[in-house]
From Swiss-Prot:
It is found in: Cytoplasm. Consists of three domains, a large central CORE domain and two small peripheral domains, NMPbind and LID, which undergo movements during catalysis. The LID domain closes over the site of phosphoryl transfer upon ATP binding. Assembling and dissambling the active center during each catalytic cycle provides an effective means to prevent ATP hydrolysis. Some bacteria have evolved a zinc-coordinating structure that stabilizes the LID domain. Its main location: cytoplasm. Belongs to the adenylate kinase family. One of its GO terms (molecular function) is ATP binding. One of its GO terms (cellular component) is cytoplasm. This is Adenylate kinase. Zn(2+) binds at C130, C133, C150, C153. It catalyses: AMP + ATP = 2 ADP. The gene is adk. Pathway: Purine metabolism; AMP biosynthesis via salvage pathway; AMP from ADP: step 1/1.
Length: 215
């Protein structure tokens, strides 16, 4: 089973990806992991990527695509895989499509965990983390017993810079601009599946399994 996982920041993609990977015995392939591995091992592609990153430039699509292609040809991908963070653009989606066609393979589905922007904003801006032990809380869904204090060690809990309203809104805007064309691309190929990401984690996974059972 070959799956592309889509969804906005804060949609719970990481949690669901882990569950899908375990249930279907396929590797969860994250673009971030691929980059880190290539860079730490000083592969030719890793060194090329680093040369752009060191200058504060975006890594060209071609480099990212080639890294992903290399990863998808490893032995653990023979029975399928779950791609998380790739493709991000229609150009990358077309490159993946071409790669699969050349191998007489095809994508089973592009799975979108759909969560409205207001819900994402509520979910992410409410997150708090302990300054000492790293314990995590949510002011609405998992509040501390004493306001502003960690249940585990009593230290202050704070909002991370990544979770401020301004930052979250910016991330949602970037996601919308990048991903909407991608959603339309997979829709046009009848490959898009969608689940409601506002439900409880277990229910979202159950819905995903039902969808994948129909592929």
């Amino acid at each position: 089973m070959k799956i592309v996982l889509l969804g906005p920041p804060g949609a719970g993609k990481g949690t669901q990806a882990k569950s899908i990977s375990n249930r279907y015995s396929i590797p969860h392939i994250s673009t971030g992991d691929i980059f880190r591995k290539n860079i730490s091992e000083n592969t030719p592609l890793g060194m090329e990527a680093r040369s752009y990153m060191d200058k504060g430039l975006l890594v060209p699509d071609e480099v990212t695509i080639n890294m992903v292609k290399d990863r998808l040809q490893e032995d653990d991908c023979l029975s399928g895989y779950l791609l998380d963070g790739f493709p991000r653009t229609v150009a990358q989606a077309e490159a993946l499509n071409e790669f699969l066609e050349n191998r007489n393979e095809q994508l089973d589905t592009a799975l979108l965990i759909d969560v409205p922007s207001e819900f994402i904003l509520d979910r992410m801006t409410g997150r708090r983390v302990c300054t000492s032990c790293g314990g995590s809380f949510h002011i609405k869904f998992n509040p501390p017993t004493i306001d502003g204090k960690c249940n585990l060690c009593g230290s202050d809990i704070v909002q991370r810079k990544d979770d401020t309203v301004e930052t979250v809104k910016e991330r949602i805007d970037v996601y919308d601009k990048q991903t909407q064309p991608l959603i339309e691309f997979y829709k046009s190929k009848n490959l898009l599946s969608m689940v409601d990401g506002t439900k409880a984690i277990d229910q979202v996974f159950e819905d995903i399994c039902k969808l994948l059972g129909e592929q």
